Amino acid sequence: MCGRTACTLAPDDVRKACTYRDKQGGRKWPNWRDGDSDKYQPSYNKSPQSNSPVLLSLKHFQKDADSSERVLAAMRWGLIPSWFNEPDPSKMQYKTNNCRSDTMTEKALYKASLFKGKRCVVLADGFYEWQRQNSEKQPYYIYFPQIKAEKSPAEQDITDWNGQRLLTMAGLFDCWEPPNGGETLYSYTVITVDSSKTMNWIHDRMPAILDGDEAVRKWLDFGEVPTKDALKLIHPIENITYHPVSTVVNNSRNNTPECMAAIILTQKKGPALSASSKKMLDWLQNKSPKKEESHSIQSPKLSQFGAPPKKTSAGLMQQWLKKEDGEPSPKRAKK
């Protein structure tokens, strides 16, 4: 599951971190939807019902746009379906911050968004997950490995981004019109899958992470990539890393660098951190997220540890994909 994230980049840096190639091969930065850059507030500790930066096809807002063009929007975390008829979205009785991949083709909460092509990419520095240890829970911060490609000045492009690589999580969104009138609310849910071997010792679920711009392109381009093909992108990945963090992150009101700073666990809980992790801790203690300030957080790559449990089954989504591809569904053995 995914119930807490960090997104600390200033709005303009979010744009730069989302650089992509258009159909002509040129590199571009997506623009923010009008007014949305002001709705997004950088934070070390984002929880459901807050606004997060979301990447989606521009065609959702401009019908004459190409579906491959991208735009940034600030959306509420926790999907409110268009058919919800209460005047207050906080009255929503279901938790919709996460959407299980194995049931989203069946559940009324999500299948309309899925089959109408309302696919989005939720952006974050990383997310937090809690590993249960007897009666206690140890939080971990999980993110993409930060590997910088060295380029000569001649190879540099104005659109090149040299900061951290943002985590790109597959999501679904919807737009809700208040029954008594008012501003349209855009909201999203993060799709989750069975955890990969890299992190299933921490938790048995993880976000569906899109690793690389080609995966992001296919997920966003609903005009060119049909649902059944897009769903093939929804699976666990191993290309992530993590480190333990302080329990200060447990309280969503805490919004300080300490939330995502690496800590040293006792030998019973895990290995000591490397010198680079300690350096990161010192760096974070002198930083705070500011909208007017451009900065990035360099995260250390740590070794994985802990014995992973067995994976669970893929579920209904894989059965649906096989049916769409003309493959026979597996029959249950007779008892």
UniProtKB/Swiss-Prot annotation:
A biological process term (GO) from this entry: DNA damage response
Gene Ontology terms: cellular component: replication fork
GO molecular function: peptidase activity; protein-DNA covalent cross-linking activity; single-stranded DNA binding
Protein's name according to its UniProt entry: Abasic site processing protein HMCES
Residue ranges, annotated region (Disordered): 24-51, 284-335
SUPFAM superfamilies given in the database record: BB1717-like
Natural source organism: Xenopus tropicalis
Thiazolidine linkage to a ring-opened DNA abasic site modification, residue list: C2
Active site: C2, E129
Activity regulation details: Formation and reversal of DNA-protein cross-link depends on DNA context. Catalyzes formation of the thiazolidine linkage in presence of abasic sites in single-stranded DNA. Mediates the reversal of the thiazolidine cross-link in presence of double stranded DNA.
Residues annotated as site: Required to stabilize abasic sites: H203
Gene: hmces
Processing and modification events after translation: Ubiquitination of the hmces DNA-protein cross-link by rfwd3 may promotes its degradation.
Family (UniProt): Belongs to the SOS response-associated peptidase family.
Domains as described in the record: The N-terminal catalytic Cys-2 residue forms a thiazolidine linkage to a ring-opened DNA abasic site. Glu-129 catalyzes reversal of the thiazolidine linkage; self-reversal is favoured by duplex DNA formation. Glu-129 is also involved in sensing abasic sites in single-stranded DNA (ssDNA). His-203 stabilizes the abasic sites by forming a hydrogen bond with the O4' hydroxyl group.
Keywords of this entry: Autocatalytic cleavage, Chromosome, Covalent protein-DNA linkage, DNA damage, DNA-binding, Hydrolase, Lyase, Protease, Ubl conjugation
InterPro entries: SRAP, SRAP-like
Superkingdom in the source lineage: Eukaryota
Subcellular location(s) of the protein: Chromosome
Subcellular location, principal: nucleus
Residues marked Required for sensing abasic sites (site): E129
Function: Sensor of abasic sites in single-stranded DNA (ssDNA) required to preserve genome integrity by promoting error-free repair of abasic sites. Acts as an enzyme that recognizes and binds abasic sites in ssDNA at replication forks and chemically modifies the lesion by forming a covalent cross-link with DNA: forms a stable thiazolidine linkage between a ring-opened abasic site and the alpha-amino and sulfhydryl substituents of its N-terminal catalytic cysteine residue. The hmces DNA-protein cross-link is then either reversed or degraded.
Bias kind Basic and acidic residues: ranges: 24-39, 321-335
